[in-house]
A protein has these predicted regions:
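The feature marks the mature, well-folded catalytic cores of soluble enzymes
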Residues: 1-51, 55-226
Length: 226
């Protein structure tokens, strides 16, 4: 009913509902990351962008959009993955792009989930060290090599590495539930004032880090605690 109501709204793209078989994941983590050639000739990450301010509907409609297919191993594979059979989940992004006829960059065997990255759409990417440097993701790659992969496939210029995410998050502390861009140059950070809460030290470390860095446009970040 909700989808049908959206179809009646003016100036909205048609809503398409389709079914695709998976193992045990959600689209946020296994779907393709979409990129669009911006009007200034640069690449922008659509899927991870905080609020879409970098691109208007017309920009996207008149630009070339492509997907990125990452490798998915149930958040850790044989090291600390959450389930053993994830072939359908791993094929989701590729099958999605094929169904809707999007060109797709194949980043396999580089392991990444959609929830582990967050972009401002202007060249800056948020990630957590606890997730992207975990032993179950890309253990043969150094931090510098992982960053180069992100820059290559996402077109970003600067990667901001938060030390931790949310306490006991089973995804090795994805960035998507601890910090997000409200708009370029402005972030919201999960916070607690309870110093006895394990999350306090984790969020405090991220706050101190974010306070010390600048984004790809050399802006000092505005940080909102939530």
């Amino acid at each position: 009913a909700f989808a049908e109501s959206l179809k009646k709204e003016e100036n909205l793209h048609p809503v398409v509902v389709f079914e695709m078989e998976t193992d045990d994941s959600w689209a946020r983590d296994v779907a393709p990351t979409f990129l669009v050639n911006r009007t200034d000739g640069k690449i922008s990450d659509l899927t991870a962008a905080g609020n879409g301010t970098a691109q208007t509907g017309d920009d996207v409609k008149n630009s070339q959009v492509r997907g990125v297919n990452w490798s998915f191993n149930a958040w850790g594979g044989e090291v600390d993955g959450l389930y053993a059979s994830y072939e359908k989940d791993n094929a989701f992004a590729w099958n999605f792009c094929r169904k809707f006829e999007f060109d797709c960059y194949d980043a396999e065997p580089f392991v990444l989930e959609g929830g582990s990255i967050h972009s401002d759409g202007e060249g800056t990417l948020l990630v957590t060290e606890s997730c992207l440097l975990s032993a179950g993701r890309n253990p043969s790659l150094t931090k510098e090599q992982i960053e180069e992969q992100l820059k290559c496939y996402l077109g970003v210029e600067k990667v901001l590495w938060l030390p931790r995410g949310i306490y006991q998050d089973e995804t090795n502390e994805h960035v998507d539930n601890v910090c997000a861009f409200l708009r370029p140059g402005e972030v919201v950070l999960a916070w607690t004032n309870n110093q006895n809460d394990p999350q306090y030290a984790m969020s405090k470390a991220s706050f101190e880090y974010l306070s010390s860095v600048r984004d790809a446009k050399a802006r000092k970040l505005i940080i909102h605690k939530l």
